[in-house]
Amino acid sequence: MKFCKPKPKSILSLDIGNKRIGLAYCDPLCITSNILPAVKRFKNNQEIKIIRNYINEYNLTGFIVGIPLDERGQMTTQAIDCKNYGQLLSYELRLPFSFVNEHSSTWESSNRFGIKKDKSGLIDSFSAKIILEQWIEEGPELEEIAGKPQIKY
């Protein structure tokens, strides 16, 4: 019987908001997750350079984007923005990625980590950590996105 070793993958998780993007990453075996400082969003997407630097520094091989679906699992305005940004990021970074339903991740991180009224981005990065932990448990696998994204920022 032949066994296949799982391919190591260090993943970046993004909790995308209108003002900031919370960030977290995991080790190659997806055992531990850590937060990174949240990055400010800029109109001209300068934050992609910062995200690229983290990807290079931590040797990350893919990323996941939290999609805030509503209670019925339907796309919200924010979910559409997150989806479009994820596709843009995949194109710019040339990395595989996946979407994860992050319904209530900010509420959960506020309760779980005791963070209230945060303007530093800490709650955003802890939300990214929760999204990452959910992805580690549930999947789905990362996918390559071919072609250029249709929506530009």
Curated annotation (Swiss-Prot):
Q: Which UniProt keywords apply?
A: Cytoplasm, Hydrolase, Nuclease, Ribosome biogenesis
Q: Which domain of life is it from?
A: Bacteria
* CDD domains recorded: YqgF
Cellular localization per UniProt: Cytoplasm
Main location per UniProt?
Answer: cytoplasm
The entry lists its GO molecular-function terms as: nuclease activity
One GO BP: rRNA 5'-end processing
Q: Which enzyme class?
A: hydrolase
Q: Name one Pfam family in it.
A: RuvX
Pull one GO CC term from this UniProt entry: cytosol
EC identifiers of the protein: 3.1.-.-
Annotated NCBIfam families: RNAse_H_YqgF
Function description: Could be a nuclease involved in processing of the 5'-end of pre-16S rRNA.
Family designation: Belongs to the YqgF nuclease family.
| Protein name (database record) | Putative pre-16S rRNA nuclease
